[in-house]
Amino acid sequence: MAIESNLLALLPSAIAANEHGELGRRTHAEPPHRYRTSFERDGARILHARAFRRLAGKTQVFARLPDDPPGDHFRSRLTHTLEVTQISRTLAHALGLNRELTEALALAHDIGHPPFGHAGEKALDHSLRAHGLGFDHNLHALRIVTWFEDRHAAFRGLNLTLGVREGIIKHSRDYSASSHPELGEYFLDLRPPLEAQLIDLADEIAYLTADLDDGLESGILSLERVRQGVPIFRIFHDSVVRQYPEARQKIAVNETLKRMMNALVTDLIDEVRARVSESGIKTLDEIRMAPKRLAALSPAMEADRAAAKGFLYDNFYNSPGMERVHNHATEVVEGLFTAIMTDPGLLPEDHRAQIPAEGLARIVADYIAGMTDSYIEQLWTRSRKG
């Protein structure tokens, strides 16, 4: 079913988040802008943040090691973020939700990731565990937007609305008040608005299709293995080959992934509409008090999503071809963490000033998490030379 034919079948307007209540509150009060909404301004602040720009130098899946040839067409955290933002805009538009809030959350959803992708995050978390701590990229993103982005004369951080800060934390998971008492202002007993719930699924749709593309492009995945292991890909690939028998393999793959993405997005829109209708929910408050999240794929499409994700983990993310990337990320991140813990003088002055309040291990993790792949390589090399 085409999205265009359903644009009038919006969700009840009272379900969409708005900035006129608690969600629009900022830590430091600001006068309203003459032309832009508060959520729109938040999106712009995220877009102009240094941490956002650094996403261009952070790995999505492929980390280019020092002796690797250039690979300019693989996705970075920044290109992935832009793809998630495009999907999220479509979802919000089709469902009649708050597009400005949705876009701000999509732009911010990966801003807390460290270098070297998930391998880097795992290594940083492992380093912190030895000090009774851990690393969570959502919570680190909150630290970035509330403190480390120091761009304004009147306040520290970006002074984002509560709605955006809550969505940054809760778009992909729920947190308990007992485990995270410091997050008390973020309504931990409530579901996030639908705008935030959709970001996690937009993220999955973007990276599933993109990682199949990058895996095939890299040669780690073969077309036949993907066809065998990902049923939804095989179905669409068969239809493309029948329709365009003369198409080159790369063109057929591109068309297949485009159709696969469209099917996932369309299914998500239709399923959210159906779940909201069946639940009888009419307001944002009812969304937030619902017993479970309402943003989900249909059972059949969820099975296809799970199969694709399982295939990627077994054949791509954990493949021998990616093992050297993971090993290098672990060596660099854990090695630099140890080096800075041994010599805190390697920290910039503004980070050292936070050690009494936060503890050395957390500040070292903050510093490393903000690095690009190339910068951490440089610093790691310098630290080894002593």
What are these regions (language model features)?
Residues 95, 106, 177:
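Basic, low-complexity intrinsically disordered segments
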Residues 117-128:
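A glycine- and small-aliphatic-rich helix-loop capping segment at beta-alpha/alpha-beta transitions
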